[in-house]
């Protein structure tokens, strides 16, 4: 069991890593390929459900209060951006990954991979409806799914693979 101070430091570290991951990006229309999903997976895997979700909540809150840590800055204006739901989705994503890590009984690689896939589904379950409604229904649901999800899945699969490989080496060691 980790000390509360160690948990707080690791939580702050993963909030910072998620912020850094926002700037390691390839712009693509309304969104970008970033490393935020990777760091959210790692937060859930290594910190567990509560501290992992807290790290992502801190990241989102710091961006909303104006720190320029989102891909296009920060501030309350992000509520109106089509991609804001994906930022919110990082919180339940980390929580679900951490919870599954506690309860699944597979070998570490498989447990991490499955947990991250389910967490990614949660991210898209929050992000896609927000994306659709923020665009005012101007896009069809099909175009929203393609542009807000399907084009990112190969890259997300790669991030989950790397998180599973790295996480299986680090799990239980932090």
Where are these regions (language model features)?
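Membrane-embedded alpha-helical hairpins and interfacial helices in multi-pass inner-membrane proteins
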Residues: 108-174
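Juxtamembrane/transmembrane-helix boundary motifs in multi-pass membrane proteins
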Residues: 2, 6, 28, 32, ...
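Hydrophobic alpha-helical transmembrane segments
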Residues: 8-13, 38-42, 52-58, 83-88, ...
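Interfacial aromatic-anchored transmembrane helix boundaries in multi-pass membrane proteins
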Residues: 22-33, 58-93
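Hydrophobic transmembrane alpha-helices
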Residues: 1-53
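Short helix-perturbing small/polar motifs within transmembrane alpha-helices
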Residues: 13, 20, 77-125
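Alpha-helical membrane-inserting segments
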Residues: 17, 21, 25, 43, ...
């Amino acid at each position: 069991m980790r000390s509360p101070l160690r948990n707080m430091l690791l939580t702050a570290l993963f909030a910072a890593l998620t912020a850094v991951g926002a700037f390691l990006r390839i712009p693509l229309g309304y969104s970008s390929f970033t490393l935020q999903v990777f760091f959210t997976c790692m937060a859930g895997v290594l910190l567990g459900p509560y501290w992992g979700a807290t790290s992502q909540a801190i990241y989102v809150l710091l961006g909303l209060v104006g720190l320029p840590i989102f891909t296009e800055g920060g501030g309350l204006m992000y509520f109106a951006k089509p991609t804001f739901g994906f930022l919110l989705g990082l919180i339940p994503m980390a929580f679900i990954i951490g919870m599954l890590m506690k309860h699944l009984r597979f070998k570490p690689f498989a447990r991490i991979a499955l947990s991250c896939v389910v967490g990614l589904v949660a991210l898209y379950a929050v992000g896609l409806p927000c994306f659709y409604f923020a665009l005012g229904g101007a896009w069809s649901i099909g175009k929203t799914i393609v542009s807000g999800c399907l084009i990112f899945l190969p890259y997300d699969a790669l991030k989950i693979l790397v998180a599973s490989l790295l996480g299986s080496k680090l799990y239980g060691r932090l």
